[in-house]
């Protein structure tokens, strides 16, 4: 899977722009606030139907305009496709090859993407919801059953919470059963996803890219290492029954997969408590690389890998090691305020961005 071109109209600081991408490394440099990150955001919006910078896509509309339009052409399984997103105050329209995409479930996974940015700090110091989102986006891009199960789970959870708020308990058991059945699949999927990521992290760590990192998955539903869905279904049933009185008082469901979390550990110590800022940034880069390899193992093809403001937290040695891995990661976009000092392949492209003007840069150090 390769992105061939990207077109932007009335998006952020871009009135109109179009860029053709290298199938390998795309290095984008320029001063701050010129539009580098906006290019990555555009690809993210096209791929996932959401932004990593705002919950309201209308905030990305060019000042004074009524809408924005994004379009990418991409090659997948030997065929070329066009994917577009139109956003105005009335809503969002997504088309693939001119056919409407009506739900995000249809969109997610069509163009797998992984983003490494400063916002990844939330995976260390943010709320549990930030870490669940990481797992949900990864698994939804790789497993159609997971994304559908997650959607049904959230619907059932909403129904149960509505009944709790209005103290209507007569049909709670119906929703409890749905939550237990759907929730067990989510929990088991998340557990094994973390275990596979841990294996990939160790492979990357063996290349001496960073310290030893481990994801410690935390769920109250897994008892004594029993990972059978039947056991987890029964455990969630039990917890929902036990917590009913408290849930009625709170008007919300206090147990289940929507309360799960994970902790990043370095050499069996909490990254949040015992790592320097530089270590944290390097370890998060490792985690995102592992995410790329996870998706690659599922699809036998690399996702689009985007790295924003790469010099903000990594030194030149770490960046060189990332670039050495780039050929195994497929198509990559990397933004920075600096011209690259590391060697790139002949098929790489270097772009400079200045006041939303994108230019091909002639500076290229070839391996």
From Swiss-Prot:
Subcellular locations according to the entry: Cytoplasm
Domain of life: Bacteria
Cellular compartments per GO CC: cytoplasm
Cross-referenced PROSITE patterns: RECF_1, RECF_2
Keyword Nucleotidyltransferase in annotation: no
Pfam families on file: SMC_N (PF02463)
First-listed, main subcellular location of the protein, grouped into a coarse class: cytoplasm
Positions bound to ATP: 30-37
Function: The RecF protein is involved in DNA metabolism; it is required for DNA replication and normal SOS inducibility. RecF binds preferentially to single-stranded, linear DNA. It also seems to bind ATP.
Similarity section: Belongs to the RecF family.
Name this polypeptide is given: DNA replication and repair protein RecF
